[in-house]
Amino acid sequence: MALPDATTPFTRRSARIGGITALVGAVGVLAGCALPYATITYGTDDPTHPSVFNSGFGGNTLFAAEPLAVVMFSFVAAVILLTPTRPILQSVAAGMLIAFGIQTFVFFFGYIGLGTYSDSSFKGSIGIGTIIGMLAGLCVLAGGLIALIARSRPAGSPSAESVTPGAPG
């Protein structure tokens, strides 16, 4: 059974909720990049507080391109969900948000290893940017899931289980 092109108020509202959730996540990704992802102490030196935007190491600022692309594309996908448009575009936008949400969560999750690593000359601890970035990735993911689940529900039915296949005609 094909999904109808007409959207229901539930679908429009869910797409808006998904879009707003994704926008909150995109702002959170920016905050996660600006705040320190770890506190690192080398030997007896003063601790450093690197962030994605200010790593403190030459040439590493190019790593900021990845989360900035996520913010830009998440913003575009969220706007698609917030505006009345073709259902296929909203489904594609929801899929993009799901992919970017997973990728962003894993991106910031990787900084946990740096933050928790310690040996005789290196001490690390997790920074607030890591936590905010991971939560922001989950917000982007949730925005896409909310919109996609709403798109997959047939019009007029409370749940997908109540749909019965139509007789061949």
Describe these PLM feature segments.
Residues A2-G169:
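Compact integral membrane and secretory-pathway proteins
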